[in-house]
């Protein structure tokens, strides 16, 4: 991204791991609220410091970061001019009701962050703080990235947001990988992803794109 003319800000918002138990616990129950506030505060700081152009800011994330990216577009639609939403949890209640089997030992930690699907008050908050239920608030262009083999959040969440956004006439684009899951593993897919992201940002923010077109036909050929 820096090579394409963008300043990049990676935020360790509250609730992030690797910064101590107190910092992590500060995110419990704060998804879509204070955890999101941290992203907004960091963005406003970058604007105030003259690092960021307030008219050319995008938000990007994958997995929970994809959730945060989607929430940024529906919760703070005047701040972000574009969003890239990758492999995202978009319906918190759905995710809580149908967690992947691999999460068996970590469901207690999940509930600390997002609540208990069997508690009515928690369910209400899940619905209120799920991007899928606030697509009508989106103003910025969005690029949805997903893998049809995603066994963590389930590709259907991505499909639902794309469908809803199109029905509402939103500026929505998508990059879907048939043979990828919760992330992008194949180098050919990574090339497609990098190209689409830089083209998307160039269109909506004005950065550079191109100058490596020769590698794409090679990737497409080797992928067949």
Feature annotation, model-predicted:
Residues 1-4, 9-224:
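Active-site-proximal cap/loop segments of hydrolase catalytic domains
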């Amino acid at each position: 991204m820096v090579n394409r003319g963008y300043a990049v800000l990676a935020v360790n918002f509250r609730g992030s791991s690797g910064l101590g138990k107190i910092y992590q616990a500060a995110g419990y129950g704060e998804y879509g609220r204070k955890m999101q506030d941290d992203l907004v505060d960091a963005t406003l700081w970058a604007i105030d410091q003259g690092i960021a152009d307030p008219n050319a800011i995008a938000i990007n994330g994958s997995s929970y970061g994809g959730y945060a990216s989607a929430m940024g577009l529906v919760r703070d639609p005047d701040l972000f001019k574009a969003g890239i939403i990758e492999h995202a949890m978009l319906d918190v209640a759905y995710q809580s009701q149908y967690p992947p089997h691999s999460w068996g030992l970590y469901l207690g930690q999940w509930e600390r962050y997002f609540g208990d699907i069997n508690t009515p008050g928690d369910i209400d908050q899940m619905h209120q703080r799920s991007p899928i239920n606030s697509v009508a608030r989106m103003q910025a262009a969005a690029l949805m990235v997903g893998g049809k083999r995603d066994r963590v959040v389930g590709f259907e969440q991505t499909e639902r947001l794309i469908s809803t956004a199109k029905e509402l006439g939103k500026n929505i684009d998508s990059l879907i990988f048939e043979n990828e899951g919760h992330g992008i593993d194949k180098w050919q897919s990574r090339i497609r992803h990098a190209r689409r992201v830089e083209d998307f940002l160039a269109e909506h923010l004005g950065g550079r794109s191109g100058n490596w077109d020769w590698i794409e036909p090679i990737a497409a050929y080797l992928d067949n």
